[in-house]
Amino acid sequence: MVTVEDVWRAQRARGPATVLAIGTATPPNCVDQSTYPDYYFRITNSEHKVELKEKFKRMCDKSMIKKRYMYLTEEILKENPLVCEYMAPSLDARQDMVVVEVPKLGKEAATKAIKEWGQPKSKITHLVFCTTSGVDMPGADYQLTKLLGLRPSVKRLMMYQQGCFAGGTVLRLAKDLAENNKGARVLVVCSEITAVTFRGPSDTHLDSLVGQSLFGDGAAAIIIGSDPIPEVEKPLFELVSAAQTILPSSDGAIDGHLREVGLTFHLLKDVPRLISMNVEKSLVEAFQPLGISDWNSLFWIAHPGGPAILDQVELKLGLKEEKLRATRHVLSEYGNMSSACVLFILDEMRKKSAEEGLKTTGEGLEWGVLFGFGPGLTVETVVLHSLCT
């Protein structure tokens, strides 16, 4: 007679969740950060705000971003003038864009990940889709299932409005799904488009202007599963542990509100300090079981919320300059793509490690950490174990 415990044990994987493939995608429209202030103030009919434009130029100069990719072209913005105002009712126009474009960009990234994985898409058992760009029913997960031609029985989870920490959240959820469902292959997709947050400048809301200088569009897809099939699947990283916490005294530090005017973001100046003051506690809790306390012995993937956050984390932990190389590179080349960012960094790291002939996917090191920071303030901490390149 089979018992419930027998069934339960048979459903569990033997080994840890493993990253099996990564794919990324961006819209074709590339924006040069050095010329963006002129373009932004022209397209939003704000060229008369000379002092504000100078402030925005300084923000862009300090951002450490060279270029970003954006779905919103000049033509699209000219056709949707309300999107260019600071607080005009424009949610319908924004929603019409993102409902179509978010799953479409996600499909591009997912197709690349599936190709690298090299297995039939019919073997995907679960789909986790994450976006902060718009809301719809049925969701972007449903649309992507249709676009990719996944099985109707694929088990879907849709995550809306999580924000910048969610690149860590999706890995935590995929880890639980893969390890608790034998043979599961989880397709994780984060797709972000700034059409929902773009707006003109305001003298009274400089925090909104900070967002306009940082955010870019991008989608990343990862396939995760336990017990990789030898000679068939190529494991890249193992997900060893994952945790989430709300930082103390951080209420209101990062807020986002979906309104008639789109998605508004509010940031306190204190965000870099709040994160840097609390990051070591998360590290200690994550790595104490492994006996690791030298943060420079790890490879690092940190959400690049902005250069000030990275600088303060680096300073607080005494990190060597090269530790955040992959993170700073992605910030420079793509801007802040919210939930997709850490997955882009993971991709950059494994590719660079292979190019440089390093022995592991984690810059030649064995252990690493992935940090996501976002509204709450919420922090996601994922412990990674690299594998041979």
Swiss-Prot record:
One function term, GO molecular function aspect: naringenin-chalcone synthase activity
Superkingdom of origin organism: Eukaryota
Pfam families membership: Chal_sti_synt_C (PF02797), Chal_sti_synt_N (PF00195)
Reaction equation(s) it catalyzes: (E)-4-coumaroyl-CoA + 3 malonyl-CoA + 3 H(+) = 2',4,4',6'-tetrahydroxychalcone + 3 CO2 + 4 CoA
Purpose: The primary product of this enzyme is 4,2',4',6'-tetrahydroxychalcone (also termed naringenin-chalcone or chalcone) which can under specific conditions spontaneously isomerize into naringenin.
Similarity remark: Belongs to the thiolase-like superfamily. Chalcone/stilbene synthases family.
Gene Ontology process terms (BP): flavonoid biosynthetic process; polyketide biosynthetic process
Gene3D superfamilies recorded: 3.40.47.10
Pathway terms, separated by semicolons: Secondary metabolite biosynthesis; flavonoid biosynthesis
Disulfide bridge map: none
Active site: 164
Name of the gene encoding the protein in the UniProt record: CHS3
Protein name: Chalcone synthase 3
EC number: 2.3.1.74
